[in-house]
C-alpha cells in the first residue's frame, strides 16, 4: 500500500510539473515589444500598463499619457481601438493660460507629472519637469472647457517642461501592435 501511495504521489508531482512547464513555455514573452501605434502606423508610445503609455517627445522627454477605449454609437467599446484621454487641468502663472504652466505630480513612482487637456486643436499633453514640488501663485487654470481666471497659491506643483498636441502628433484611432 505504501508503494502505491508513493507511486501515485510521484505521478501527480510529475504531471503537475509537466503542466507547470507547459504553462511557462506558453507564457514566454514575445520577442517583439508591445507598442501603441497611431492611425498612420507611427509609434505613439510604449505601455506602462493598460491605460498609461510612455510617450517620447522630440526633445527626448519621456512622459506618461493616458488612453481610453473608443465607443460606438450604442456605447459598446470598439475592439482593439483607443484614443487619447482628456479631462485634466493645467495651472498657469499668467491670467490668460499662456505662460507659466504647472501640473500636479504623478501618483506613479518614477514617472513625470502630466495633464491632458482637450483644446479646439486636439488633446494636448503637458509634461512636468523632474524634481521636487513647489508652491505657485496661480492666476488661471486651463480645463477642457477653456481658461478660467483664478487667484490662488497652490502647492504640490511642477513646472511644465514639454508640451505636445497628441491628436496632431499621433492621430487616433490608436492600437497595440
Q: What positions do the PLM features span?
A:
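An exposed acidic His-Trp-rich patch
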Residues: 98-148
Amino acid at each position: 500500500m505504501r508503494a502505491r501511495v508513493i507511486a501515485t504521489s510521484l505521478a501527480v508531482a510529475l504531471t503537475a510539473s509537466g503542466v507547470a512547464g507547459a504553462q511557462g513555455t506558453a507564457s514566454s514573452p514575445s520577442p517583439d515589444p508591445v507598442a501603441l501605434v497611431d492611425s498612420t502606423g507611427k509609434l505613439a508610445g510604449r505601455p506602462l500598463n493598460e491605460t498609461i503609455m510612455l510617450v517620447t517627445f522630440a526633445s527626448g522627454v519621456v512622459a506618461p499619457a493616458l488612453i481610453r477605449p473608443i465607443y460606438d454609437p450604442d456605447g459598446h467599446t470598439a475592439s482593439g481601438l483607443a484614443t487619447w484621454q482628456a479631462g485634466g487641468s493645467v495651472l498657469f502663472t499668467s491670467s490668460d493660460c499662456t505662460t507659466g504652466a504647472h501640473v500636479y505630480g504623478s501618483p506613479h513612482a518614477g514617472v513625470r507629472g502630466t495633464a491632458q487637456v482637450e483644446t479646439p486643436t486636439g488633446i494636448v499633453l503637458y509634461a512636468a519637469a523632474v524634481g521636487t514640488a513647489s508652491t505657485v501663485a496661480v492666476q488661471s487654470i486651463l480645463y477642457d472647457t477653456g481658461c478660467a481666471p483664478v487667484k490662488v497659491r497652490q502647492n504640490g506643483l511642477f513646472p511644465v517642461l514639454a508640451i505636445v498636441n497628441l491628436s496632431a502628433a499621433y492621430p487616433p484611432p490608436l492600437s497595440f501592435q
